[in-house]
Amino acid sequence: GLLKNELQKIEFYSKNKKLTSEAILKLTNLTENFSMSELIDNCLAKNQKKTILILNENNFSNEDCIQIIRLFLNKLKKILQLSKELEKNNNLEKTISEARPPIFWKDKEITKKQISIWKTKNIKNLIYKLNEIELSMKKNFNISINLVTNFILEQSTLKTNN
């Protein structure tokens, strides 16, 4: 059903026109392309359904894994900084509004959720785990996608001990 509709859409559009691969990609929206940042944000927000959806919809390669790890580490360092600030002032709104660099308005809600879930000790443990995974990936590049996927699924489903 769905595939037939997409093929009919392409056929209708392509009458008397030269069809490019870009046009086909725009016409067919069988899969939604999510960014690595969305994957990491949803994982850290413990949004298991969305995390699994992103993993299933995207076709990440072993090469993408290093970039995912780097983005994950950068995000965790930012959350660690915010978490430490929250421990000092005990005010989530103040922590978010006074963050430097400022948090983009679209990211504020998910960042609040992440800070509420992850405490300083847990964040540090995640950073250590990610460094170990990166080292394992460099030793055996062929299993990169398995290491990263397992880590992401584990973090999105695990209950944190705060």
Language-model features, listed with the residues they occupy:
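Non-catalytic interfacial helical region
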Residues: 1-41, 45, 116, 133-144, ...
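Small-residue-rich helix-loop
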Residues: 18-122, 159-160
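Short helix/strand-capping connector loops at secondary-structure junctions
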Residues: 109-111, 126-136
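Short coil/turn segments at secondary-structure boundaries
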Residues: 22, 83-86, 127, 142-146
